[in-house]
């Protein structure tokens, strides 16, 4: 029946949708603890942590994984998805436990259990650490693969012995997903009244999270102070303007290090990528977050009818999202458009629509140059008299 006497209200479901950025600094952590009465966590089962108190209750004060959480929370109020594994009898067995896999019961173990972070807690790790264990190539390689799946950065520990050993270790990799820190740090231990050595990766992860909160995910954690340490495992020479100092030699090998300069600072912007396009960790992270935001923000657009309104709504939503990023300072500029060449009649008939999103990210000022000249140009001004 087409006749109706009265008011009709119809929902017109058109218009651009907002696109939200995902959390940039959820930390995925895997380390050792001892199950028992002092620890509520179970081996290989992810736990969501938001404070030292949570970490102590889950893993027990003094466990390796608790100390890693403490290192993170010394700098940032971070969300951590933590997976504890039991101590093994040999280094090889310990590496296998940390790497993890899938058990006979179909449960993920070790680092692989971090993949369950999103389904369990709606928290997808973006920064991965396995403090100390990542100094083993097998563990680092596993972290690289996991980081690729999660669109994350794996923060590796170096061998923590010599600069030469660190450079040699870095040459084993060529991935944009890996960010390596060497040497480790020294931390005061109140239980023993002495300094102890600790891996640097957890401290770097905390600094990444703090930088995200203070400056934005597009900012580098380099040249920012690490809290809670009393020194480094070995001295790292840093002299302003000296290309041959040890800190610069490590950076030249794409290794971040820790320098003492108005406090202890992380020093280095680069991933271990063999592709110069992805040298800066800031570019990798910006691309990851933009891509994931676009993916998550367009579930509504799947299976809608391909009309002019549909193409307009998606395009306007993308432009609004990128405009917001530009206004925040996350990107310099951008362009968004439906691709006229790819969107042929045959492609549209198959339900495929293509948009191009191009943007320029914000690189870190790794090497400001100041050209200073002394000149006699104004010397005769001393003769000027009023």
From Swiss-Prot:
Signal sequence bounds: none
Compartments where found: Secreted
Main location per the UniProt record: secreted
Keywords: Secreted
SS bond list: none
Residue ranges crossing the lipid bilayer per the database entry: none
GO cellular component: extracellular region
InterPro entries referenced in this protein's UniProt entry, alphabetically: Gp18_domIII_N, Phage_sheath_subtilisin, Phage_Tail_Sheath_Structural, Tail_sheath_C
Pfam hit, one: Phage_sheath_1C
Other observations noted: The gene for this protein is encoded in a region with many other potential prophage genes.
Entry's family note: Belongs to the myoviridae tail sheath protein family.
Name of the protein described by the UniProt record: Putative prophage major tail sheath protein
Gene: gpFI
